From Swiss-Prot:
Keywords: Amidation, D-amino acid, Disulfide bond, Hydroxylation, Neurotoxin, Secreted, Signal, Toxin
4-hydroxyproline modifications at: 52
Source organism per UniProt: Conus lenavati (Cone snail)
Region forming the signal peptide: 1-18
Disulfide bonds: 51-57
Propiece residues: 19-47
Protein name in the entry: Contryphan-Lnv
């Protein structure tokens, strides 16, 4: 189950990062807020709680 949750979080984070490349999304949200706030807005999960066990979150 833990691996499934990790896979879902990783795939969702990749989708969020992919959305950041779209011009419409870039116009709606500043790029400075994209790295810190995108996951919090789309996943409703604080990025700080993911980082300790997800070294690839940056």
């Amino acid at each position: 189950i833990l691996l499934l949750v990790a896979a879902v979080l990783l795939s969702t984070q990749v989708m969020v990062q992919g959305d950041g490349d779209q011009p419409a999304y870039r116009n709606a949200v500043p790029r400075d807020d994209n790295t810190g706030g995108a996951s919090r807005k789309f996943l409703n999960v604080p990025r700080e709680s993911e980082c300790p066990w997800r070294p690839w979150c940056g």
